[in-house]
């Protein structure tokens, strides 16, 4: 689903996991002629701390974006009334 703001739902998962492939993340960025991308997802638990998988995926997205010329600006994790920026934490 593409939103008017340019936001797009890539995957809907379960309470504890979802599958995300960089190809799907960048598909709509490429089709939209985007030069940058902000990746965001939620943790239904409400804890916005990044998991090892969150960090690994974000690093893969950053590397993929560098290859195709679309900058990953940040990877955000939302929780209950809070969020975590992996860029701010220097994790990507």
Model-identified regions with their sequence ranges:
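Hydrophobic structural segments
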Residues: 5-8
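Active-site-proximal loop/helix of nucleotide/amide-processing enzymes and allied scaffolds
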Residues: 11-92
């Amino acid at each position: 689903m593409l939103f008017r703001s340019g936001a797009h739902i890539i995957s809907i998962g379960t309470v504890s996991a979802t599958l995300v492939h960089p190809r799907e993340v960048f598909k709509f960025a490429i089709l939209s002629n985007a030069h940058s991308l902000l990746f965001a997802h939620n943790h239904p638990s409400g804890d916005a701390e990044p998991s090892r998988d969150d960090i690994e995926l974000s690093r893969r997205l950053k590397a993929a974006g560098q290859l195709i010329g679309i900058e990953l600006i940040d990877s955000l994790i939302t929780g209950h009334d809070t969020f975590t920026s992996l860029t701010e934490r220097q994790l990507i």
